[in-house]
């Protein structure tokens, strides 16, 4: 295989967006809605969303208040929380994990999580008012 064989895509991003890249150890064990909730809780815990919710966050980021130093310190914690949740779910025999749901759709009897290794790379898009968001 060559690098030119790879699939690529592009997505428009904005300051304040969270990008999560991970192995199947995360996505087989943690539902996308739960990943979103965890990311939102992380934003609230570290003060990226306060006093007005997401609208206030977007206004603050648009005005150039990116909190980039705090983000650099806090973003590893989000990856850690997600990995921990994946491990917890992988060991839960009663959970209908994303893997279990897909298995059942394909007539494979599976319940619980899917024991697997997990790697998560979490990124927080930051910059100042004059930065391009491309």
Q: Predicted segment positions?
A:
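C-terminal catalytic subdomain
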Residues: 2-22, 26-134
């Amino acid at each position: 295989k060559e690098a030119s064989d790879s699939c690529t895509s592009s997505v428009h991003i904005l300051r304040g967006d969270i990008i999560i890249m991970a192995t199947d150890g995360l996505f087989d064990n943690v539902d996308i809605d739960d990943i979103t909730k965890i990311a939102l809780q992380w934003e609230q815990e570290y003060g990226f969303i306060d006093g007005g919710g997401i609208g206030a966050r977007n206004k603050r980021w648009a005005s150039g208040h990116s909190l980039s130093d705090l983000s650099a310190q806090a973003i590893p914690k989000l990856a850690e929380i997600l990995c921990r949740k994946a491990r917890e779910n992988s060991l839960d025999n009663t959970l209908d994990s994303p893997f279990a749901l897909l298995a059942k759709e394909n007539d494979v009897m599976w319940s619980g999580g899917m024991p697997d290794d997990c790697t998560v790379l979490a990124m927080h898009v930051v910059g100042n008012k004059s930065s391009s968001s491309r």
